[in-house]
Amino acid sequence: MYTLISIIGKYISCLPALLIVAFLTISERKTMASMQRRLGQNIVGYYGLLQAFADALKLLLKEYVAPTQANIILLFLGPIITLIFSLLGYRVIPYGSGLFISDFNLGILYILAVSSLATYGILLAGWSANSKYAFLGSLRSTAQLISYELLLRFYILLVILFTGSLNLTTIIESQKVVYFILPLLPIFLIFFIGCIAETNRAPFDLAEAESELVSGFMTEHSAVIFMIFFFLAQYASIVLICILSSVLFLGGYLNILPLNTYNVCDFNSLFSDYLINGLSSLNLAIKTAFLIFVFIWVRASFPRIRFDQLMSVCWTILLPIIIAYVVLLPCIVIGLNSSILLI
């Protein structure tokens, strides 16, 4: 019983991420409106800041109409599975120095596992709807996720080779001298492309291509189930993948400025722990917000590509490049270490 309560408590601790998702939808709309030279949402609340809550209330109050021949249980279960596994990844993220929900040595492996399991929710939702558009969208999404998850694992393998650890806190602390984005800049660019494809975002949103599949695997979902699928699960995955990118390549909660501002004044006698944790969390938030902005920027700038082009780029261009890096980079590092020892 105690174990069950502990598991439920740790899961509930991930729910504040849903509030971040609400404001992310607002910021995306306002950013895209600015890029397209229009006003965007500005009616509900001050400067339109309550628009996401109004949309959520509208979807909650709508009647849910399920397809006649659909498997109702799996149709409901698919979005819920996707949302649960999208939120579970937040448990192992170090939000600051000593500020985390759970910290264990296989943190990055845990995130890869739960992100892979979210694919089953998409597959269930598409198959159980008894609709050709939803089924084709779920098949596309599954093929796309499997392909680009393979790439992400190779990219993360390089970071593990640099640090020798699967612990996210250790990976962050290993970047005190230099962020990994500098020696691994080409890897980071390809990794970020893989992250966009992993989250089904434009220009890789082929699983829900409106011109081909209506709304893909979400075609037959409406009301609160659509809100779980689109507003919550998808945007929670975007925030999680941006946090993971900042942890792996941008130093996570490490200070953005070259100066160690934590030691500018003596805070040992007054709120030292709270101040340091707050500053470190702010650093992570700024880096994550920048990556989310790049997500939105890419969506507003590039048209959707064809599905065969997406898969071809993955298997014929990006995968050979990353395999070459995985083989050559350790050889270069070992060679440099040997030459230094000889000197």
Swiss-Prot record:
Chain's role: Core subunit of the mitochondrial membrane respiratory chain NADH dehydrogenase (Complex I) that is believed to belong to the minimal assembly required for catalysis. Complex I functions in the transfer of electrons from NADH to the respiratory chain. The immediate electron acceptor for the enzyme is believed to be ubiquinone.
UniProt keyword list: Electron transport, Membrane, Mitochondrion, Mitochondrion inner membrane, NAD, Respiratory chain, Translocase, Transmembrane, Transmembrane helix, Transport, Ubiquinone
Record bears the keyword Mitochondrion: yes
GO BP of this protein: aerobic respiration
InterPro entries per the UniProt record, alphabetical: NADH_UbQ_OxRdtase_su1/FPO, NADH_UbQ_OxRdtase_su1_CS
Compartments where found: Mitochondrion inner membrane
Topology with respect to the bilayer: Multi-pass membrane protein
Assigned EC number: 7.1.1.2
Molecular function as annotated in GO: NADH dehydrogenase (ubiquinone) activity
Principal subcellular localisation of the protein: mitochondrion
One annotated Gene Ontology cellular component of this protein: mitochondrial inner membrane
Pfam family, one: NADHdh
Family note: Belongs to the complex I subunit 1 family.
PROSITE patterns found in the cross-reference section: COMPLEX1_ND1_1 (PS00667), COMPLEX1_ND1_2 (PS00668)
PANTHER family linked to this entry: NADH DEHYDROGENASE SUBUNIT 1, NADH-UBIQUINONE OXIDOREDUCTASE CHAIN 1
Transmembrane annotation, as ranges: 4-24, 70-90, 106-126, 154-174, 177-197, 224-244, 278-298, 316-336
Chemical reaction(s) catalysed: a ubiquinone + NADH + 5 H(+)(in) = a ubiquinol + NAD(+) + 4 H(+)(out)
Protein name as catalogued: NADH-ubiquinone oxidoreductase chain 1
